[in-house]
Amino acid sequence: MTLRDWMRTFGEARSIDINNDLERGYEAALLIQTLELEYYGDRPIRPNLQLSVPRSLQSTILRKFHTAANICRLTFEAIKPNVSQLDSQEYRKYQLIETIVNRYAPKRSSRSTSISRAPDALPRSLLGLVDKVRRQLDPTSEATLVAGFRRRRDSTLISLKIILLLILVPLLVQQISRTYLITPAIDYLAPELPFLSYPKPQLEEQAVEKLRVFKAEIEFDALLKGDSIPSQDELQKALAIKAIQLKDEADKESTHAIKNVLADLAALIAFAFVCIINREELRVLRGFLDEAIYGLSDSAKAFAIILFTDMFVGFHSPEGWQVLLQGIANHFGFPARENFILLFIATFPVILATIFKYWIFRYLNRVSPSSVATLRGMNGSS
C-alpha cells in the first residue's frame, strides 16, 4: 500500500469519526431542545427551578440534560478544528450544537466579561475575510472540496437508490404474490372454505340491479326488432341463466378483498424488510431530505405548506377525502357507508389542521421564522 493509499484510508476513517461525533452531538442537542419544550416552556433549562412534576422525574430530566450537555460540549470541541470540512447539512447540525453549548456555557467572572466586551483590535468581519482567504490558499483546500463533493454525490446516489427500493420492492412483491401465489391459493380453497367467499350486501345489490337491467334489455331488443315479447317461461329461463352467471361473478369478487389484504400484507413485510436491512441508507436519506427541504427558499417552503394544507384540509378537500375513502372501502371489501364518510370528513381534516397549525407555531416558527412570515403574507394576500 502506497503512502497515498494510507492517507486516503486515514482521511476516510477520520471523516467517519467526525460524522459519528456530529450525529451523537446533534441527537444530544435535539434532546435538550425537547426537554426545553416539554418541561420549561421552550426556555433554557434551569436546574434550580422546581417543576410541577414528581421529584424523581425532575432528577431524571436533569440527569439527561447534564449528560446531553456534556456530549454537546465534547462534540463541539472535537469538530471545531475541522469545521471547514463540513458540508451545508453537517454545518447546520454543528450550528445547533454550538448554540446549545453557548447557551449553557458557564458564566465568566466580571473581569473576563469586561475584557470580552472590550473592542477588538480588528473588526470581526475583517478577521473572517482573512480566515476565508487563508482557507482558500490552504494546499489541502482542494482535497477537502473534492472530498466534500464526493460525499454529497454518494449521499445523493444512495438516497435515490433507497427511494427506488422503498417504492419498487413493495409494489413488485404485492403484484407478484397476488398473481402467482395468493390468487391461485384462494381460488383453490374458496369452494372448501366458505368464509373466504362470504356474501356481501353491496355485491348482492349490484347483482340484482344487473339482473333487472338484463330483463329490460331483453324486452327492449324484442321491441326494436318487432318480435313479440318473450313469454313468462322463456323470460324466467333466461333470467335463471343470467342469475347463475351473476352469482359466479359475485363469488369471485367476494374473494378480491381477502386477496387484496394478503397482498398488501406481503408488501408491508417487504417494506419493513427493506427498512431493516438498509438502516444506514435510511439515515443518509433522512439527511438528504433535510438538506433538500431546508435548502428551499422561504417562498418555496411557504408555497409547499399552502399546497399541502389546501389539498388535505382546504375548501375542496372533502371531495378528495370522499373519493379516497370509497376507494379504500372497495379495496378491502367494506361497504362505503355515507354516514361514516361524512363523519370522517367533518372531523379528521379539522384535527389534521389543528396539528399542522401547532407544528407551525411550535417548531417552524423557531426553525425558520422567515418562512412563517412569508406564509402569513401569502395567506393574507390570498
From Swiss-Prot:
Q: Which Pfam family name is an example for this entry?
A: CemA
Report keywords, A-Z: Cell inner membrane, Cell membrane, Hydrogen ion transport, Ion transport, Membrane, Transmembrane, Transmembrane helix, Transport
The protein's superkingdom reads Bacteria
Where does it live in the cell?
A: Cell inner membrane
| Positions of transmembrane segments | 156-176, 257-277, 305-325, 340-360
MF terms from GO for this chain are: proton transmembrane transporter activity
Q: Does the keyword Calcium apply?
A: no
Answer yes or no on keyword rRNA processing: no
What the record says about family reads: Belongs to the CemA family.
Q: What is this protein called?
A: Proton extrusion protein PxcA
